[in-house]
């Protein structure tokens, strides 16, 4: 179903009466004109007054304000989305800064945990393991033929909350909402998918309301065969799809990305999207301090697929700035629950092995511990940047932050774990422990910190700055793959839009109200790089920009004309 053509063109549709009112992509509610009500058998089915979308949005905003809890606000917005998608996106667009934390992190975490309890109406595709041999038929049941973006999860590692089974569907729904709200991708082009391979969450298995397959998770060869069946079915149904892997467990995330990134246009937002926005933030923060990222020493807490993905992209950026690969890797230190990753540590995962430090280079360190803790690393490395992707709250202690600040006058501290209940340290504490000198960026939204009568804005290192623009760029350019260079171009473009760099003050990342401008710029950079990399047909810059404009959907009602099926 095409919904992105210019507003001047009417849309010819075959649906009428109550069926039309039940179709979220087409429903206008009280905004159907008198003529449309007559032509589509809606007379008497709606109140007398014909309203504009702004009048509808104002009523919805007043209703929204009447809800007291974030989860109730989330449920309300999801209800609008499942009733009238155009109104939903107009409302979100009008109040993006207020509503983004409600439709996505941190509130979406609670929505995933309570998915079966708060379930109202079907959205997206649920593919359970018992139905694995019917995937082609299942995907044929999707009514929208022109799907261009799929976000898929298996629900095993939802934010920092772990295994949520099919409750993980809240993540693809929320992510795709941001593709549209921030990146202008028509909701008619998007499809959320959950692969229901069971759950190891005993609380869910014991819950009489749980709506997923009640079975322990399948693993190993059975699991990978199931995912492969899904990938092949998607390629058959939509050969030019952009597929985003979301919230897969560490043991599966990197292998799936490695296996499929050159087979289908795909990326993993937890690994590559998080890395791209983090690197963009660090490039901007370094420039604001009058230096380059290649001059910084960086310590990570958390050496999973997300942390290692960020580290590898940092290393790639510092090589672009002139470092050799060996010199770049010597500036990055990875700490996990077993301590600093070293070349003598057993049982490392394949993606961790290139990020170890050589024990021979650590012999001069001031420590008597066999296992090198985060405090040991901070004390000896004297880092400029500390990044948390551990998923564990409170691990950036006062002692660690003060030790870092002792050797770094303006430390950059980024507790990126989601949701807020999992953050390594709160911005309030970090600002206080560094006497107001830290630059703080978080994974979840936090209010500005007031410390000694001064206001410190807290940047949210939100993947929404990156993935909507990547999606728009891929669609506009027709890219067949997402390369590392395309991701780096997104990071560089984000850094160029930093108010702190451009104005000498303000946040290190753009305000959310400007996110559509940033997404368009990233889309152009990504599309241009795709052309340079040979994964998209080369066009002029003007043609690429026109393609971006043509694909940028706006939440506006179109005139309807009746046609037969």
From Swiss-Prot:
GO terms of biological process kind: malate metabolic process
Residues the entry annotates as binding a divalent metal cation: 246-247, 270
Residues of the active site: 104, 175
GO CC term, one of those recorded: cytosol
Site feature location: Important for activity: 270
A single GO molecular function term of this UniProt record: oxaloacetate decarboxylase activity
Enzyme Commission number(s) from the entry: 1.1.1.38
InterPro entries to which the protein is assigned, alphabetical: Aminoacid_DH-like_N_sf (IPR046346), Malic_enzyme_CS (IPR015884), Malic_N_dom (IPR012301), Malic_N_dom_sf (IPR037062), Malic_NAD-bd (IPR012302), Malic_OxRdtase (IPR001891), NAD(P)-bd_dom_sf (IPR036291), NAD_malic_enz_proteobac (IPR023667)
SUPFAM superfamilies, per the entry: Aminoacid dehydrogenase-like, N-terminal domain, NAD(P)-binding Rossmann-fold domains
Enzyme class (EC, first level): oxidoreductase
Cofactor binding annotation: Divalent metal cations. Prefers magnesium or manganese.
SMART domains: malic, Malic_M
Cofactor: Mg(2+); Mn(2+)
Assigned keywords, A-Z: Metal-binding, NAD, Oxidoreductase
Positions bound to NAD(+): 157, 270, 418
Superkingdom of origin: Bacteria
Catalytic activity: (S)-malate + NAD(+) = pyruvate + CO2 + NADH; oxaloacetate + H(+) = pyruvate + CO2
Quaternary structure (record): Homotetramer.
Family under the similarity heading: Belongs to the malic enzymes family.
Name of the molecule in the record: NAD-dependent malic enzyme
Organism: Salmonella arizonae (strain ATCC BAA-731 / CDC346-86 / RSK2980)
Gene that encodes it: maeA
């Amino acid at each position: 179903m095409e919904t992105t053509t210019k507003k001047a063109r009417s849309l010819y549709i075959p649906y009428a009466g109550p069926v039309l009112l039940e179709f979220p992509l087409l429903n206008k509610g009280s905004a159907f004109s008198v003529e449309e009500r007559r032509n589509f058998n809606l007379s008497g089915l709606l109140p007398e007054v014909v309203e504009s979308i702004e009048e509808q949005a104002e009523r919805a905003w007043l209703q929204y304000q009447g809800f007291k809890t974030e989860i109730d606000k989330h449920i309300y917005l999801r209800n609008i989305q499942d009733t009238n998608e155009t109104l939903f996106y107009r409302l979100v667009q009008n109040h993006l800064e207020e509503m983004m934390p409600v439709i996505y992190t941190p509130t979406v975490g609670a929505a995933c945990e309570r998915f079966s309890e708060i379930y109202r109406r079907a959205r997206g595709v649920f593919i359970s393991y018992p139905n694995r041999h019917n995937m082609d038929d299942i995907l044929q049941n999707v009514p929208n033929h022109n799907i261009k973006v799929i976000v898929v999860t298996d629900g095993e590692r939802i934010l920092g909350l772990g295994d949520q089974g099919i409750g993980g569907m809240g993540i693809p729904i929320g992510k795709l909402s941001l593709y549209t709200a921030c990146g202008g991708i028509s909701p008619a082009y998007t499809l959320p998918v959950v692969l229901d391979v069971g759950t190891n969450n005993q609380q869910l298995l014991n819950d009489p309301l749980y709506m997923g397959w009640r079975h322990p998770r399948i693993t190993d060869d059975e699991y990978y065969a199931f995912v492969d069946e899904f990938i092949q079915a998607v390629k058959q149904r939509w050969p030019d799809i952009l597929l985003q892997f979301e919230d897969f467990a560490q043991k599966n995330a990197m292998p799936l990305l490695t296996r499929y990134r050159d087979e289908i246009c795909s990326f993993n937002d937890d690994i590559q999207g998080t890395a791209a926005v983090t690197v963009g933030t660090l490039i901007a923060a370094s420039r604001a301090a009058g230096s380059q990222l290649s001059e910084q020493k960086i310590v990570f807490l958390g050496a999973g697929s997300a942390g290692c993905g960020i580290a590898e992209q940092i290393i790639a950026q510092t090589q672009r700035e002139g470092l050799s690969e060996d010199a770049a890797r010597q500036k990055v230190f990875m700490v996990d629950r077993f301590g600093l990753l070293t070349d003598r540590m057993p049982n490392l995962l394949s993606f961790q092995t290139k990020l170890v430090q050589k024990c021979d280079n650590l012999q001069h360190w001031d420590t008597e511990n066999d296992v090198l803790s985060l405090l040991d690393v901070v004390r000896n490395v004297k880092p400029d940047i500390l990044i948390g992707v551990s998923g564990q709250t409170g691990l950036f202690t006062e002692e660690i932050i003060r030790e870092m600040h002792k050797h770094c006058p303006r430390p950059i501290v980024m507790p990126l774990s989601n949701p807020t209940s999992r953050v390594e340290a709160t911005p309030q504490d970090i600002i206080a422990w560094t006497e107001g000198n830290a630059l703080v960026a978080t994974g979840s939204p936090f209010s500005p910190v007031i410390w000694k009568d001064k206001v410190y804005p807290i940047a949210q290192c939100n993947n929404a700055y990156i993935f909507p623009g990547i999606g728009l760029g891929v669609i506009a350019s027709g890219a067949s793959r997402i390369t590392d260079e395309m991701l780096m171009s997104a990071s560089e473009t984000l850094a160029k839009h930093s108010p702190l760099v451009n104005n000498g003050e303000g946040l290190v990342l753009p305000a959310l109200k400007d996110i559509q401008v940033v997404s368009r710029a990233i889309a152009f950079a990504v599309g241009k790089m795709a052309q340079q990399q040979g994964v998209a047909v080369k066009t002029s810059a003007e043609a690429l920009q026109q393609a971006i404009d043509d694909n940028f959907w706006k939440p506006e009602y179109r005139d309807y004309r009746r046609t037969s099926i």
